[in-house]
Structures are given as C-alpha cells and as structure tokens.
C-alpha cells in the first residue's frame, strides 16, 4: 500500500478574519495508522470477462444484468422482489414499509446465499446495501424460529435455548447504526420484528437475551469471559455470526480478539457435533445439509469450560497465528483433501453456526491479509463480489485539484461554496487529523460557512448528536476518517478531501460516503506534490477501468504493473467459483 507521507498544508493556528484565504507558515505532520501491514494487490487473470477464472476469489454470475439495465447499476432487475429472493411476507412488507421497494444487486445475490445456510463473504462497494443484505435473511430466519418457540420459555429464562444472532462491529457508532436499522424493520403494529440490544460503550449485558446482539469484540469478551454459565449458554445460542467491516476486524488490534471469539464459537460447534453423535442425553437436531468444517484435533487437550487463563489464551492465539503463517498457497486446488502446511491432524465436525463476513474493501493477495485469512479459514464459503468493488462508481464524478501552500485554502472554500447552495445540501470534508479538522473548520467559518466538527476528541454521545443533526438538517460536515468507514448518511452529494487520503483503502472509504444507494455524487480531491504518486496511481487505475486495489502496492513500479495487467494473462489455478453480480 502506497502511503502519502506528506506534511499537511493545513495548519493548527487560527486564520485572521481579514485574510481567510492566506495560510500561515506553520505546518504539521500527519500521523498515519497503517491499516494493512503488507502489500496487497489482487492478480487479474484478464480484462476479458470470458477469460476470468479467479478474480479475488469470485466468479462471474450475473454481470450481464448491469449491461442489460443500462445506467441502473444499483438495483436488481425489476422482476426481482424481496419475496422472490426467499424472504417471508413479514420481512418483505417491513422492508417495503421502510422505503426499500426493490432489492439492490448486492442484496439480490447475498440474501439467497445467506438463506442457504452456508458461510458467506460479501465484498461489495460502499453504499450497495450490504447491511440490509445480511439483516433481512437473518431476521427472516430468526423470526421463523421464534414463531416455533413458546413465549413462556422466552420470558422465564434469561438465556433460553433459542437461536440468536451476534453482529460484531469495530466501534460503538457502527453498533448503534446497526441497532437503528434492525429497529427500523417493524410489523403491521409498528413494533420491531425482533428484539435487538447493543453491548458496547456504556451499555452492559442485557437482563434478558435478545434475538440479536450487536457488539464490539472487546465489549463482548469482557461480558462473556468472566462468567462461565453466561459464556457457555450464549455460545450455544448463537446461530448466526456477522463480522461487519471484516477487513478491519481481521487486522491490527482487533485480530487477536476476533481469533479468540472464532475459537470459542468453533469449539462450541465441536461440542454440539460430539453431543449429536453420541447417544447421551436427548438427541439434538443437526441440519445434515449444512456443510462441515475443519477444526483442530483437541482430544488430547480439552477446552477448559471454566475461566480461561491468559497463558491459555495466548497459546491458542500463537497456535492460530502459526497456522496462518503455514497456510497453503492460493494456487492450491479447491476442495483438495491435502491440507499443505498444517502441522496438526484435523477432524471434521458437523456445522451448527453460520459465519457471515461483510466488507467494502477486502484485499486477498498475501496469506495474512483479511481476504487471505478468510480464504483459508472458510474454504467452502460463498463469496459475493460487487461489480464496483475497489472501483470507481459510474454514478460518481471526480474532480482532481493539485494545490500549493498558497492556493489550498482558496480551492477548499471554492469547492465547498460550489456545492453548498442550499441548507439541505450535505457536504463531507475530510482531513487527516483532529488538528486538521479544527483548522479546516476555522477556515470555513471565517469564510462565513457554518460547519459541523466530528473527530475522536468529542465524546461518543456528542458525536452521535452531531451525526444525527447532520443527517437531519444537512450542511457541511468536517471530519476525520472516523466518519469514513461504515457510517451511513443519506443524500451526501459532495465529498471533499481537504487532506488527501493516506492510502488507497482510506480513499475508497471516503469517496464511498456519496453516490450511495443508486444516487449520484461528486468527489473533489485536493492534493499536493507530496501526494502525487498515490493520486496518479489511483487516477490511472480509474482511467483504465482497473480496481483501485492496484494502488495498494508499496512498490514504486506498480504503475507499470497496472498497464501490463491490461495485456497479460496471469497463470493461476482455478479456484472454487462463487457469486459475482
């Protein structure tokens, strides 16, 4: 991944009201948090669709639908309805009553995949409808299960043995957003179809287990690990596990927490499988049609169902990371019985949980990238890819403005004023640091442009209120990348990069705040000489119709590779096909 190692031309000090367009001489460094530690660029077999065999682990299935519908690159064909995808009447009506008359292309493919019961990995562009794409089928299945349960059993026990869904998000704001979306799907009486609770921030464990728990990894572990009974019953109840923003959750500081949770969930699957195969106790119903999963042979070292020591926890994580390091190459034949690189014998256990991974950016080249880890851990998963994953949306107009220290403020004010003609317009302005956000906001306000300020120095409740006001009233929203990933603000017509993104990943998430849900949008990117390499790489990829992922590479010669990929066909082994729309 190429990073912009520039010093921001926005500065910390105030700008005099008499000269709002002049920049002070002091400049500050921008600190970067590396989202990915390794080079990640996907290999393309060919630009010709007919020749593609393995592109990001996805197969072509319905690409022709986009061409057939012409300019409609968001919605599925008009003949596709919520009910035709397999959803019940209750959920279909709830979606329509919430304003979702038709499924998007993403939803039309991922909903049947999730309803099939298989593990699903959804990698689709921002604003393509991924959240409702996984919520709808999960709510549908949980609703059907709830109808078969006795209400008295649900009320009497805080942890009834029923199916529930666990949704993991990287931060509190995204957790609360998912909760709002679940509560937005209501029945004919206006009541939510299912009970949902957030376990994050100041919100502790619910008194009565809901149908859906939305949590951050750390908050969930803090609430289930200290209490043995809670942990065991909770893990047994979890039927559907969703990892929203999966690329972030599988990298960096989240990785060990996610590994810990997956180990717990998979061990419970192993225990359920053992109980089903034995004649002890009452028989347990296991769906034989659900695929099986490889788990470690732990017969010689049983899982301690009491408290888990730090030493045991670290040992499990080290073993798992060793497994990742020993993963077979991506060229290995799909479905091969030979597990190259695995040191321990593994057994097959019957599946009792479904794992769903959601991401807008998902690099797969490299064993330790998020996509590489998923390809290894969930080899039988269905992969769903958006047509514009890592690409420039055809509904998005991009403007590129190279600026200097003397011209950046004027360019910024002009870009904001050109789009802020009415109070209802929504413009998001991105800067790389908290200090830069404050500097940009000061500049705009001295130019008589009122704006919101959004960054990590605000408390969670303050951020929630700021975001709610912006959603409701519009205006100019100056923010860090805290608002770039996953946050859904409808009708954002313009995104401005006052500081250019530090990586191609950040760039994709920023521009994904506009042109969402089939709408059109504009992105104005201000960049300096220090950003030029990254900008040229992205622009070249966009111009050639290549994924912006080609700009993820750290190597200086990657631009030549972009050109070569248009003419050379890579020699790659055929991988298991999945769904591409």
Curated annotation (Swiss-Prot):
Which parts of the sequence form the motif Q motif?
80-108
**What do the Gene Ontology cellular component annotations say?**
chloroplast
Q: Where is this motif: DEAD box?
A: 244-247
Q: Which InterPro entries match?
A: DEAD/DEAH_box_helicase_dom, Helicase_ATP-bd, Helicase_C-like, P-loop_NTPase, RNA_helicase_DEAD_Q_motif
Would the keyword Signal turn up in this protein's UniProt record?
A: no
Top-rank taxon of the source lineage equals Eukaryota
**This enzyme's EC code(s):** 3.6.4.13
Disulfide bonds listed in the record: none
Asked whether the UniProt record includes Hydrolase among its keywords, one would answer yes
Q: Which reaction does it catalyse?
A: ATP + H2O = ADP + phosphate + H(+)
**Where along the chain is ATP bound?**
124-131
- The residues covered by the Helicase C-terminal domain are 408-566
Q: Which UniProt keywords apply?
A: ATP-binding, Helicase, Hydrolase, Nucleotide-binding, RNA-binding
Domain Helicase ATP-binding intervals: 111-380
Q: What is known of its domains?
A: The Q motif is unique to and characteristic of the DEAD box family of RNA helicases and controls ATP binding and hydrolysis.
Name of this chain's protein: DEAD-box ATP-dependent RNA helicase 22
């Amino acid at each position: 991944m190429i990073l912009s190692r520039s010093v921001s031309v926005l500065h910390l000090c105030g700008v005099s009201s008499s000269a709002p367009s002049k920049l002070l001489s002091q400049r500050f460094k921008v600190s970067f948090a590396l989202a990915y530690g390794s080079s990640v660029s996907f290999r393309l077999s060919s630009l010709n669709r007919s020749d593609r065999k393995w592109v990001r682990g996805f197969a072509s299935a319905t690409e022709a639908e986009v061409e057939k519908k012409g300019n409609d690159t968001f919605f599925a064909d008009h003949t596709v309805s919520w009910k035709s995808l397999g959803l019940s009447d209750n959920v279909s009506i709830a979606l329509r009553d919430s304003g979702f008359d038709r499924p998007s292309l993403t939803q039309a493919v991922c909903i049947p995949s999730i309803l099939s019961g298989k593990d699903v990995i959804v990698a689709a562009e921002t604003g393509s409808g991924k959240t409702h794409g996984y919520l709808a089928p999960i709510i549908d299945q949980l609703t059907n299960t709830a109808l078969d349960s006795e209400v008295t059993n649900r009320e009497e026990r805080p942890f009834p043995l029923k199916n529930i869904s666990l949704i993991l998000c990287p931060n509190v704001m995204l957790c609360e957003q998912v909760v709002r979306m679940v509560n937005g799907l209501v029945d004919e009486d206006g009541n939510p179809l299912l009970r949902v609770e957030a376990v994050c921030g100041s919100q502790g464990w619910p008194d009565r287990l809901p149908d859906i728990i939305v949590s951050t990894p750390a908050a969930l572990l803090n609430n289930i690990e200290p209490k043995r009974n809670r942990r065991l019953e909770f893990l047994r109840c979890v039927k559907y596990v969703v990892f929203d923003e999966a690329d972030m959750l599988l990298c960096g500081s989240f990785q060990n927490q996610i590994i810990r949770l997956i180990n717990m969930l998979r061990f419970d699957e192993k225990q359920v499988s053992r109980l089903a195969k034995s004649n002890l106790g009452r028989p347990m119903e296991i769906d034989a049609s659900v695929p099986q999963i490889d788990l470690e042979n732990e017969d010689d070292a049983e899982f301690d169902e009491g408290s888990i020591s730090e030493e045991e926890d670290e040992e499990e994580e080290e073993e798992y990371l060793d497994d990742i390091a020993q993963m077979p190459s991506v060229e290995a034949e799909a479905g091969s019985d030979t597990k190259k690189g695995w040191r321990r014998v593994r057994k097959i256990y019957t599946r009792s949980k479904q794992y769903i991974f959601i991401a807008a950016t998902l690099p797969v080249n490299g064993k330790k990238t998020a996509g590489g880890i998923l390809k290894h851990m969930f080899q039988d998963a269905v992969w769903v890819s958006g047509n514009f994953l890592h690409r420039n949306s055809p509904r998005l107009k991009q403007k590129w403005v190279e600026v200097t220290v003397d011209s950046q403020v004027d360019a910024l004010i002009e870009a904001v004023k050109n789009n802020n003609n009415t109070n209802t317009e929504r413009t998001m302005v991105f800067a790389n640091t908290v200090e830069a956000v404050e500097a940009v906001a000061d500049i705009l306000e001295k130019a008589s442009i009122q704006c919101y300020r959004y960054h990590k120095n605000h408390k969670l409740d303050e951020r929630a209120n700021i975001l709610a006001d912006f959603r409701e009233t519009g205006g100019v929203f100056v923010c860090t990348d805290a608002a770039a990933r996953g946050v859904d603000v409808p009708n954002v017509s313009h995104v401005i990069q006052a500081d250019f993104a530090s990586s191609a990943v950040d760039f994709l998430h920023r521009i994904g705040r506009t042109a969402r849900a089939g709408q059109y949008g504009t992105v104005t990117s201000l960049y300096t000489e220090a950003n030029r390499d990254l900008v040229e790489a992205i622009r070249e990829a966009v111009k050639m119709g290549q994924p912006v992922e080609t700009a993820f590479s750290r190597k200086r010669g990657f631009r030549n590779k972009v050109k070569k990929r248009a003419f050379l066909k890579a020699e790659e082994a055929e991988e298991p096909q999945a769904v591409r729309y």
